Amino acid sequence: MSEEQAALKADSQRSSAEKHTTDRIVTEELIAGWKALQPSCYTRVLVGAKTDLGSVRENNEDKFDFLEPSRESALASKGRLYGVADGMGGHSAGQIASELAMKTVIRSYYADQSTRIENSLQYAISEANGLIFDTAQMIPDRRDMGTTLTLGVLYEDRLIVAHTGDSRAYLLREGEIEQITRDHSWVAEQVSMGALTLQQAQLSPFRNIITRSIGTQPNVEPDFYLVELHEGDRILLCSDGLTGHLEPEDIVRLAGSQSAISAGPSVTAMKLVEVANERGGRDNITVLILDILEIEHQENAEELENLQAKPLTLLNEDEEESETNSTENGHDRSLFGSVI
């Protein structure tokens, strides 16, 4: 064999060895990346929601929305996103603001590349805030548009809540209720400072003044909260159309009892809205409920491939009742709630 042929053979062997090594490294990186995305546990949840015009208003400025990804990578890295928004502003501006907020947040949240849930939520909220603010500046009829926004990301066995305004998130656990969020309102600040009692705040003519919202300023800083979930927990997101008529003790009686939990989130959401309307229904009313059915810890990375086989039953209640079960593989599941 000539020196030239020997050199070519050596180069070929070296290239083959390098390719094998490269392929092995790439494979190892892919496996490591897959395992890094693997959730430590998987939470089965039942969802029910209802939005209602109320007994007085002509337009429904409330919106709820959520997205439960069917793609394993999105589910593992971003979790499931749920939200309630209560728009404000004349000439249908409130409807537009709440709709823009929910759609923009969901799209931006899942598009963001950050590995931190809070960072992605902050980015998504900033995108929604900027869009609504810019729209309000360009169109005179929408000058005062804005919206509250209360979001919950279900990630593994935790709920990460991002919040602006006076819509609320509650935790119902073992017959007790805890308000997760703190209202961004003038009366809430006065109560916090001791200047008003709760009873005075409820009767104050300034009780509807919001001190922080989406779209009314160039920038907004949401508050963040973390809830460690237990099996049997019930999470409730709602607009102030509910809490303006129902006290926490009313909510826990109607939504936190064993019979209410057994009835399911959809029936409970309808009951809460019904009672709020019976007590006057002065505002639009929106309720979204998450029932934490099971928290299953994953032992092996391979088990993640089977997540989509697990049932994720979904039930929406709008002006007419509709029911949707788990979607086909390869499609994200979302539902947008509105009454127009």
Indicate where each model-derived feature is located.
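PP2C/PPM-type serine/threonine phosphatase catalytic domain
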Residues: 1-340
